[in-house]
Amino acid sequence: MTKYIFVTGGVVSSIGKGIVAASLGRLLKNRGLKVTIQKFDPYINIDPGTMSPYQHGEVYVTDDGAETDLDLGHYERFIDINLNKYSNVTTGKIYSEVLRKERKGEYLGATVQVIPHITDALKEKIKRAASTTDSDVIITEVGGTVGDIESLPFLEALRQMKADVGSENVMYIHTTLLPYLKAAGEMKTKPTQHSVKELRGLGIQPNMLVIRTEEPVEQGIKNKLAQFCDVNSEAVIESRNVEHLYQIPLNLQAQSMDQIVCDHLKLNAPQADMTEWSAMVDKVMNLRKTTKIALVGKYVELPDAYLSVVEALKHSGYANDTAIDLKWVNANDVTVDNAADLLGDADGIIVPGGFGQRGTEGKIQAIRYARENDVPMLGICLGMQLTCVEFARHVLNMEGANSFELEPSTKYPIIDIMRDQIDIEDMGGTLRLGLYPCKLKPGSKAAMAYNNQEVVQRRHRHRYEFNNKFRPEFEAAGFVFSGVSPDNRLVEIVELKEKKFFVAAQYHPELQSRPNRPEELYTAFVTAAIKNSN
């Protein structure tokens, strides 16, 4: 029988529910249990694919092409699993599916209501996520805060699950903030008490509290919360601020969180062996070197827009015993005249993805600086496309060369729209999304990065591609197409072989990086940057 764990939040948003859920998932996985995890987002968008990065942060793409919340990146990195489209559910997605069924007459003339139709659809998503992965345990995080009007149908569905599958198969974990008033010198439990009261008013009694705090919590405070919130005192778990996120699973294990969960759900599983994880954390805490990487992007005011890129760089740093000192460079600020001033102290330059015209000329100048000064450079998605544009302009002398996306009237459309995208008008969910194969050119830097594999599978999110009619001119000038689709139709990786490391990929390698298993192309880039710093 599948076990269901529901993680809710109270008092404030962005309290770290996703990290708590991911950490618990890692502990349960290391007990030998098969775990999956999903995120419920109460916003009305179908998915975050068309949302501004300033609003939402990065869009995380799964193997099967779902555009999802960035928390799924945390889930995959912590638990080391590949999630699917059932792992992210929004209000918009649920309502659109219910309305589509109503239009088809599938409700046989019934009045369609929040209860039971919306709540039933939500419960079906929970069960489908568990069944498609054949999991022993599914953890479901509900975005937002208890008391938000948007989350009411989600919480009602969670309440009903207890009756549907039995109380011994369901556990409710509530995460809250425990504020510390410096002037009074004490922690205040009242916000948590009121949050739990709100949750209980919706019919959900939490079985565990996870309290986010900046200071150590005395047992007396835990006992008080246990008494007023009707949970066992040992089930009041402290989640204190840490230097590195990957410390959190170990901190939760030290408080027997996973054992309490297993006892409640009657899961007979051995103790979690966290030896490898602990060794990784110890290494992360004691890195001996530092390497400066300049990240040239258009959304640098919100680092979450590049969350997976940053994490992938860190992972590759761990493998090289080096901390990554990130220098955030706004692409809008980079010009041919100041590129050396902005980028001259960087050991490596990364140009990640993005959409739209703004910042593209600055990215092109950053790529040009890297090429002309032989600074290790990694381009991702749009960064790969602009790498091709830069080469066309400044090496092949194709004045005005550009991407068709950015300048439809360009004489040299180096990057063109994919053939199967021409007649598509909708923006959402219509890109080339998900896992696709990439055939590597033997002897190339890309092939060497991937240990001379013939083919690698990586996740994509794009609508435009390199225009193949320009391939002969590029190749004649020494531009190497080191990764292509198996049918040789789509360019996946480009590079300049004579440079220390000048490689750009159409796909998003960062989405498959793990703290204990860094993505190979990122590792090759960071390794080259380290050598460049010596």
Swiss-Prot record:
Residues where L-glutamine binds: Y54, G354, L382, G383, M384, Q385, E405, R463
Pfam families found in the cross-reference section: CTP_synth_N (PF06418), GATase (PF00117)
Active-site residue numbers: C381, H508, E510
Glutamine amidotransferase type-1 domain span: 292-534
Binding annotation for ATP: S14, I15, G16, K17, G18, I19, D71, R240, N241, V242
Annotated region (Amidoligase domain), positions in chain: 1-267
Binding site for Mg(2+): D71, E141
Record field: catalytic activity: UTP + L-glutamine + ATP + H2O = CTP + L-glutamate + ADP + phosphate + 2 H(+); L-glutamine + H2O = L-glutamate + NH4(+); UTP + NH4(+) + ATP = CTP + ADP + phosphate + 2 H(+)
Pathway assigned in UniProt: Pyrimidine metabolism; CTP biosynthesis via de novo pathway; CTP from UDP: step 2/2
InterPro entries in UniProt: Class_I_gatase-like (IPR029062), CTP_synthase (IPR004468), CTP_synthase_N (IPR017456), GATASE (IPR017926), GATase1_CTP_Synthase (IPR033828), P-loop_NTPase (IPR027417)
PROSITE patterns for the chain: GATASE_TYPE_1 (PS51273)
EC number: 6.3.4.2
Binding site for UTP: S13, K188, T189, K190, P191, T192, Q193, K224
GO molecular function, one term: ATP binding
GO terms classed as biological process: 'de novo' CTP biosynthetic process; pyrimidine nucleobase biosynthetic process
Domain of life: Bacteria
Free-text function comment from the UniProt entry: Catalyzes the ATP-dependent amination of UTP to CTP with either L-glutamine or ammonia as the source of nitrogen. Regulates intracellular CTP levels through interactions with the four ribonucleotide triphosphates.
Subunit structure: Homotetramer.
HAMAP family assigned: PyrG
Alphabetized PANTHER family for the sequence: CTP SYNTHASE (PTHR11550), CTP SYNTHASE-RELATED (PTHR11550:SF0)
Miscellaneous note of the record: CTPSs have evolved a hybrid strategy for distinguishing between UTP and CTP. The overlapping regions of the product feedback inhibitory and substrate sites recognize a common feature in both compounds, the triphosphate moiety. To differentiate isosteric substrate and product pyrimidine rings, an additional pocket far from the expected kinase/ligase catalytic site, specifically recognizes the cytosine and ribose portions of the product inhibitor.
Entry-linked NCBIfam families: PRK05380.1, PyrG
Name of the protein this chain belongs to: CTP synthase
Organism, as annotated: Streptococcus pyogenes serotype M28 (strain MGAS6180)
Organism ancestry: Bacteria, Bacillati, Bacillota, Bacilli, Lactobacillales
